[in-house]
Structures are given as structure tokens and as C-alpha cells.
Regions:
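PLP-dependent class I/II
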Residues: 1-128
Length: 128
């Protein structure tokens, strides 16, 4: 079976058409990644490398485990994800889902205002 003519024409347009929207999206993701990295590394107990081409940060959150956070204590990043979602209403994927206990995956594929609000909620929760 072959690729349909419509799909071929659409693919050609996608790679040969105006790519300014792609450049704008890339700039937005770079800006959000830098912002999220800065906000995460300002939280005591969190260390994070700058994202390199991804749409998420993958910080080490081991410094938050075993601590009183919002009156509760998480012993792993899965428990921490539940605690943060329950109390701060911020969602992240625990590192255990990627074979990396003690880490967390925070997506920055969202608007700037929502990103800042979420990181501020997380920081407020951790700082008590």
C-alpha cells in the first residue's frame, strides 16, 4: 500500500511551507524551560539540570523526601506526587514511572502564567 496523494501533499507543505510558527513555538518552549528550571532550583531540596530540547524538567527531588511538607511526609516521588497534587493542585509524573526514583517530570507545555502559578504553589508548599 502507498501513501495517499493527500497525505503526500500535506507532508510536502509541512516541510516546505512557512515555518515561522515553529520558530515561535521553539522560542516559547526554550523560555518556559529556562523559567521552570530557575523556579525549581530556587526550591530548597530540589536540584535540576537545564532541559535540553525536551518539553519538561526532570529534577532530583530526593531533598524533599522524608521532610514534613504540608503536614505530611513523602518517602518516594510517587508519594510526593500525590501529596503535591492533593495539597498544591500541581501535577507531575513521579520518576519511578521512568525508572528514576527520587526524580520528578514537570512539563512546561503550558502557558507562562500557569507555569509560574504552579511553580509558586509548589514552592509555597515546600517552604511551609
Amino acid at each position: 500500500s502507498n501513501v495517499s496523494n493527500v497525505a503526500q501533499i500535506a507532508a510536502l507543505e509541512a516541510v516546505s511551507g512557512d515555518l515561522s510558527a515553529v520558530a515561535m513555538m521553539r522560542e516559547s518552549f526554550e523560555r518556559r524551560g529556562t523559567l521552570m528550571h530557575k523556579m525549581l532550583t530556587a526550591i530548597p531540596g530540589v536540584t535540576c539540570m537545564e532541559p535540553q530540547g525536551a518539553f519538561y524538567c526532570f529534577p532530583n527531588v530526593r531533598g524533599l523526601l522524608g521532610r514534613d511538607i504540608g503536614g505530611k511526609t513523602a518517602t518516594n516521588s510517587m508519594e510526593l506526587a500525590d501529596l503535591v497534587l492533593d495539597v498544591a493542585k500541581v501535577a507531575f509524573v513521579p520518576g519511578e514511572a521512568f525508572g528514576a526514583p527520587g526524580y520528578a517530570r514537570f512539563s512546561f507545555a503550558l502557558g507562562d502564567d500557569d507555569l509560574v502559578e504552579g511553580m509558586e504553589r509548589l514552592a509555597t508548599l515546600v517552604r511551609g
